[in-house]
Amino acid sequence: VLIPRPDTEILVEEVMKLYSNEQKLSVLDIGTGSGCIIISILKDRPKFNGIAIDISKKAINIAKYNAKMHHLNNRIKFYKTSVDNFFKDKYDLIVSNPPYISRLQIKYLDKDILGFEPIQALEGGIDGFNVYSKIVKKSSMLLKVGGKLVLEIGFDQKFKMLKLLKKHVFV
């Protein structure tokens, strides 16, 4: 399971700016890992409910435990599945911090990161966009009209992400 970092806090803060405490929304967290994103969002927005998915059974179990510790287990449902195979409902908000480090950059990561986190939670394929491509494509089917997609991306991935979003009519 990926260890949350300050960049992920920024993702959560940006979501908080988009929605008020009074709104009632459905949230989908793709690649939930420890559950830190959806748990942080739901803890701050009491009228939100969520679904969290991950391909790792271990990650799902950790996320369930964390949700229970924060008294949110009745507001989050967890599924062990990939984004490719997920077709349940439509959502107001989709969030994700997927693996986005390119295969070439992985070898340059700090040993502290590589020694404690599964490569599956870090590497996003040859160009870092394997999972992004799946998420963006699927989000066009899973978002309600007017829904939002909020993703954490790498420092050098902005223009490639904009191109991908345009391809799937997000911008």
Indicate residue ranges for each PLM-predicted region.
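Glycine/small-residue-rich loop that forms an oxyanion/phosphate-binding "nest" at active or ligand-binding sites
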Residues: 3
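Conserved SAM/SAH cofactor-binding pocket of Class I
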Residues: 7-108
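Class I S-adenosylmethionine-dependent transferase superfamily signal
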Residues: 15, 41, 113, 135-139
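Mobile active-site "lid"/loop adjacent to the S-adenosyl-L-methionine
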Residues: 100-131
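Conserved Class I SAM-dependent methyltransferase catalytic core
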Residues: 126-171
